Amino acid sequence: MEVLAAETTSQQERLQAIAEKRKRQAEIENKRRQLEDERRQLQHLKSKALRERWLLEGTPSSASEGDEDLRRQMQDDEQKTRLLEDSVSRLEKEIEVLERGDSAPATAKENAAAPSPVRAPAPSPAKEERKTEVVMNSQQTPVGTPKDKRVSNTPLRTVDGSPMMKAAMYSVEITVEKDKVTGETRVLSSTTLLPRQPLPLGIKVYEDETKVVHAVDGTAENGIHPLSSSEVDELIHKADEVTLSEAGSTAGAAETRGAVEGAARTTPSRREITGVQAQPGEATSGPPGIQPGQEPPVTMIFMGYQNVEDEAETKKVLGLQDTITAELVVIEDAAEPKEPAPPNGSAAEPPTEAASREENQAGPEATTSDPQDLDMKKHRCKCCSIM
């Protein structure tokens, strides 16, 4: 019965210690959150006071009601700033005390709360002394604290307290500009890089289990200012927005460039061909597809048809009703055969040209032709009708 009562008491004390530890951790988290909020309010008040002081310096010496209200507001802001600074320092001290109490050594009751299913025999004096030494040694080492604390300035982290290191997956280089008047931080550019083993020379301003932030440039001008977790998250969010905006602008420029190139491809450009001289007789203004010297095509439109049986009606339809018909009879002499007049009424060719053409066509065989053919040529007469 005594063993069961002791085990029950030790179990209750252990549960009570665990509950107190959880309560202390929750209180630490609440105070940290309150500290972050007050730091943000303090920074806002400082930037506001700096802006109001700058506005007062630019106003003329003659005081007005607006300037008096502004000075009164500045005094109230300075008083709030002092109160916030005192509150921030107090919260920092309270958090430090709570963290120190959380890592304090456990009580002897917590260390001796391990249940023993088998009742051990009464220890001898030597064993009692040895047990006391073990308890003292365990009390000197806080429960839950690592025995070997590794401090590293690199993003390499230990895994479960083992000496195996976890390498960084990537690094982000963020260019930040801070307005000295308003205190606002603006991200200029964000570039994702491979992790560099010789780390850039800078000052570490933030570190947790997943991220390490180094201030590379501008530490001499702006001083060393450690960042909080909320500030780091806000900085990463702004960097992501800048990266997305740059990607969107690049895609829009590529689409515009592709549209311009497609329009230039589809629209044929007019080119001037040098080194070609137009001939006087060439037709330069004709329709496309017609070579020089060719007649342009004629467009014919079918207007209908009409059946005509009478010849007079036919002439009337064709417009030949009042035309004059003439017949020309040419009688050739037997000594000098002449060519008849052309049927279309044009001028006859000179006799020399006609004779030479007949000689060229007939050749030497013309002199030895049969007399029957010559008689046929003499007695043949031709007539034509001129309309």
Curated annotation (Swiss-Prot):
A single Gene Ontology molecular function, please? D3 dopamine receptor binding
Report keywords, A-Z. Acetylation, Cell membrane, Cell projection, Cell shape, Coiled coil, Lipoprotein, Membrane, Methylation, Palmitate, Phosphoprotein, Prenylation, Synapse
Which lineage ranks, top first, belong to the organism behind this chain? Eukaryota, Metazoa, Chordata, Craniata, Vertebrata
Q: Which residues carry this modification: Cysteine methyl ester?
A: C384
Keyword Cell wall biogenesis/degradation in the entry? The reply is no
Q: Could you list the residues that carry lipid attachment of the S-palmitoyl cysteine kind.
A: C381, C383
Q: What is this protein called?
A: Paralemmin-1
Which InterPro entries does the entry link to? Paralemmin
**Major place of residence:** membrane
Q: How does it sit in the membrane?
A: Lipid-anchor
- Output compositional bias ranges, type Low complexity: 104-117, 286-296
Cellular compartments annotated: Cell membrane; Cell projection, Filopodium membrane; Cell projection, Axon; Cell projection, Dendrite
